[in-house]
């Protein structure tokens, strides 16, 4: 089986050519550092409204590594990801246990790293977790639910309340630690579709640091268009 476990410099050589290259997102921690039996998928930056997708090597029986340029906005990246998710899920040759990961650069360890997203289900444009939870209130009643929003300025709100990026992890952890009713806390993630893919990955990894036996991250992610959301007369 093929195995990825290479330095960042070597990877940049692999993802560059004469006319195109992929500028990977950066983060300060490695979620995963190697992956076996993989197919690479590339999304190149042309401009802020066009993505060039190279998916010729996407073999449905392998793990897929998504190498996506950090400059691309979510509004062009996510629909492409959704199409590829659908293709793999509905392939007659899919392999049980195969995963999908995003690649990024660990700026501290100076290595290539990976963030799994196999179970993520994207909801786009008109959906937001606050309304989704309300529609499915019975299913979410047994949990503590936090709507975490990353707006178009990449600022954070939790249930409509502003919170500094540096305070988010401690805020959620403190809540989970001091709650003794036995309920699991679920974080529901929302991203303005104008955010770049680089910002998206950094925010995802920030939230990943919270994953524990008391705190879960919802598999639903909301990539919203603020102009298409219902008017709730509230802060998102």
At which residue positions do the language-model features occur?
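C-terminal motif of bacterial Sec signal peptides marking the signal peptidase cleavage site
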Residues: 13-16
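Positively charged n-region of N-terminal signal peptides that target proteins for export
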Residues: 1-4
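Long, low-hydrophobicity, acidic/polar, solvent-exposed interaction domains
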Residues: 18-236
């Amino acid at each position: 089986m093929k195995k990825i476990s290479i330095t960042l410099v070597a990877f940049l050589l692999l993802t560059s050519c004469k006319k195109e290259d992929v500028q990977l997102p950066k983060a300060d921690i490695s979620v995963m550092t190697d992956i076996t039996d993989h197919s690479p998928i590339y999304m190149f930056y042309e401009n802020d409204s066009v993505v060039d997708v190279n998916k010729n090597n996407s073999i449905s029986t392998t793990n897929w590594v998504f190498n996506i340029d950090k400059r691309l906005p979510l509004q062009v990246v996510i629909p492409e990801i959704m199409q590829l998710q659908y293709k793999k899920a509905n392939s007659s040759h899919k392999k049980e246990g195969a995963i999908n990961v995003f690649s990024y650069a660990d700026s501290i360890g100076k290595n290539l790293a990976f963030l799994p997203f196999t179970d993520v289900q994207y909801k786009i444009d008109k959906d937001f977790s606050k309304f989704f939870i309300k529609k499915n209130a019975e299913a979410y009643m047994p949990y503590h639910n936090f709507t975490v929003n990353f707006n178009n300025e990449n600022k954070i709100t939790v249930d409509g309340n502003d919170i500094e990026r540096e305070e988010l992890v401690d805020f959620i952890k403190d809540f989970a630690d001091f709650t003794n009713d036995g309920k699991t806390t679920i974080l529901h993630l929302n991203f303005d579709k104008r955010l770049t893919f680089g910002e998206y990955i950094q925010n995802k990894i920030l939230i990943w640091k919270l994953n524990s036996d008391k705190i879960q991250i919802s598999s639903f992610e909301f990539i919203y268009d603020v102009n298409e959301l219902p008017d709730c007369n509230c802060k998102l």
